[in-house]
Amino acid sequence: MQRDAIAAARNAGCSSGRISQPPPPPFYSAATGIYSSIHPPVALPTDPSLTLVAHLFARLPLADPGAPTLVDAATASAVSRADLRRLVASLAAGLRRRHGVRKGSVVLLLLPNSVAFPVSFLAVLAAGAVATTMNPSSSPAEIAAQARATGACLVLASRDGAARLPPLAAPVVLVPEILDHSAAADDGDDDQRVFAAFRAMLDGGGGDGTETAVPVVGQDDAVAILYSSGTSGRSKGVVLTHRNLIAMTELFVRFEASQYHARGARENVYMAALPMSHVYGLSLFAVGLLSIGATVVVMRRFDAGDAVAAIGRYKVTHMPLVPPIMAAMVRAAAAGGVPPSQVASLVQVSCGAAPITAALIHEFLQAFPHVDFIQGYGMTESTAVGTRGFNTSKHKKYTSVGLLAPNMHAKIVHLESSSCLPPGFSGELWLHGPGIMKGYLSDDDDACTRKDGWLRTGDIAYFDLDGYLYIVGRLKDTIKYKGFQIAPGDLEEVLIHHPEILDVAVTSAEDEEAGEIPVAFVVRRSGSNLSCKQVMEYVAKQVAPYKRVRKVVFVEAIPKSPAGKVLRRLLRNSHDTAAAATSSCSISSKL
């Protein structure tokens, strides 16, 4: 492997007891063990009273106010730059007047991708409140748990999602997928009734016309609570500040976009096929890209054929995606469903959120040879800021997740000695920079996750001599299913309540279609005839579809440390599960 060659080179010339080592590269300090970005620093706003929405709209170009900023891929219904400013301001006023939303209030967004998502998200922030997002396919139990943990005072949900809502203390307002600023957009009297509350808020909330007081909010106030599996254990609420998201906008989105402007790229048109409820999609399509005046073409749900058609129709130039979407595009091309003329406008495809195989990268480059392909790395805890791929005439390192973003620093820490490691050596990746979260909603394990401002990612990685980062494994237990994060503890909490299950541990297995799938190792109670199918059906009724257990292995005992901690690595690394299992079964990751 490349890192082995680097390490071997360091030991060259060791004869006669003399060790000759090359000087460290300029981006690495041997004295401190810290890696720095090779990009020039980016100046970030210092005004402590600045908010994210104010920053975005100050950055949004004033020229051409009628230019589309959000476009519904299916209908071509658009929100212009001027519309965006007006709709966010009026909806924020409606939230304050109609529902008493104020500084510190938490509003839960249970919404699918739509042009209404960014407007709703930014309006919550403009009202002085905190937004917390959820995948709209979440189960009633998951919705109730997050609403309770965050103290949500209001829920914004889609019409389809309303059917899954459990009884909640907070009121629910249904949000349409299309915004053309009038009730006439709704289909018939029933739609007008269903969305009447939202339309009333969108008109500013009515009242006597007196503006409610706008809360005083600053950079260090919370702006979002996004859920992540963290570095281990159960899902945790990640508290992000206005400062975090402003840094993300500048260091991730605007900086990367500037690289393509510098190359003389045409007007940027981005396809939003990633869920905006996740930090990857949220940071791009509901926040950062809106500040540069790009057009965001929103797919309500991904379909490879529809995506190809939308690329051709809207002349899409950039397509951020995750490995399963990338694989679907490759399959569509192999089946002859991607005419070259339809994707000729595509300049860049970026991939993140989950590991990707070298084979899939090769297949993609064969199918789309004109596209600049890069990978990136970030976490919810780093507000998606970490590294971004950067191809040059000299370097095209497609399997790397790229270079450190501006203003970011990293360490590679030895797993046993905790010493810092130079390029070519693998260890745990630690990150430091302005995107690092304020903390978890519950600070129970914050100290072990952050140390002196450093975020311990739980990922095993190394830097090469050019400053490119490679992820080679991980310490943490998170399962990445089609780009979605699944905390094993969440599934174990569901399974252990089954009356016929004595003990359980959930880990991951590699899967060609999904990247990874959840695998449940189950110890049945004495006399139980519980089947694999029954276990999977039990879980499926209580979690979002992407969280379903895809394989069940019945075992006699769960391996644990003397302290009682489940040794997931033994389960994950065991290639001969049949030797330990009494029986097993699985379902397709395509379901």
Curated annotation (Swiss-Prot):
Enzyme Commission (EC) number: 6.2.1.12
Binding site for ATP: 228-232, 236, 375-376, 380, 459, 474, 565
Keyword entries, A-Z: ATP-binding, Ligase, Magnesium, Nucleotide-binding
Enzyme kind, highest EC tier: ligase
UniProt-listed GO biological process terms: phenylpropanoid metabolic process; ubiquinone biosynthetic process
Residues holding CoA: 301, 482-483
One Pfam family it belongs to: AMP-binding
GO-annotated molecular function: 4-coumarate-CoA ligase activity; ATP binding; CoA-ligase activity; trans-cinnamate-CoA ligase activity
Annotated segments matching region SBD1: 303-375
InterPro entries hit by this protein: AMP-bd_C, AMP-bd_C_sf, AMP-binding_CS, AMP-dep_synth/lig_dom, ANL_N_sf
Record-linked SUPFAM superfamilies: Acetyl-CoA synthetase-like (SSF56801)
Disulfide-bonded cysteines: none
Location of the region described as SBD2 in the Swiss-Prot/TrEMBL record: 376-440
Assigned GO CC terms: peroxisome
Listed CDD domains: 4CL
Domain of life: Eukaryota
Cofactor list: Mg(2+)
Known function: Carboxylate--CoA ligase that may use 4-coumarate as substrate. Follows a two-step reaction mechanism, wherein the carboxylate substrate first undergoes adenylation by ATP, followed by a thioesterification in the presence of CoA to yield the final CoA thioester.
Family membership noted in the UniProt record: Belongs to the ATP-dependent AMP-binding enzyme family.
Free-text note on domains in this protein's UniProt record: Both substrate-binding domains (SBD1 and SBD2) are involved in the substrate recognition, and are sufficient to confer the substrate specificity.
Listed name of the protein: 4-coumarate--CoA ligase-like 3
Organism: Oryza sativa subsp. japonica
Taxonomy of the source species: Eukaryota, Viridiplantae, Streptophyta, Embryophyta, Tracheophyta
